[in-house]
Amino acid sequence: MKLEAVHHVAVIVSDYKRSREFYVEKLGFEVIRENYRAERDDWKLDLRLGDMELEIFGMSHAPVRPSYPEACGLRHLAFRVDDIDEAVEWLASRGIETETVRMDSFTGKRMTFFHDPDGLPLELHE
């Protein structure tokens, strides 16, 4: 067996409508599938950005993350951009604040962080 690529990343959110608006309307993800699962009383939303898929589970009863951002599990989700200054301006025009742009000492590339509505760290990496 040979692993070919990461197929998707899954994120549990506390407010489905708020997170759907954030990822689709503000960040520009494309909706692939959307389904309410009555037996679980939750929403499942499959999104696409380029070749990457993001799976959103809207679970109002999910426990909160125990510590931030150093809890076990997903630390952050990073997006590659060509021009970080342009990307920061684009996010600002949608009401999304970012941290100060800084240099990644390991890669020598510029990066910054922002957060989704549940506080999940999201990274821009040039």
What are these regions (language model features)?
Residues 12-54:
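Core segments of cupin and vicinal oxygen chelate
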Residues 54-56, 124:
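Generic preference for hydrophobic
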Residues 1-18, 74-79:
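N-terminal beta-strand motif that seeds the catalytic metal site of vicinal oxygen chelate
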Residues 32-34, 40-42, 56, 61-67, ...:
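A short, acidic/glycine-rich surface segment
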Residues 41-43, 73, 108:
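Exposed loop/turn and edge beta-strand positions of beta-sandwich/beta-sheet ligand-binding modules
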Residues 1-2, 88-126:
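Vicinal oxygen chelate
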Residues 1, 37, 45-46, 66-69, ...:
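Short secondary-structure boundary/capping segments
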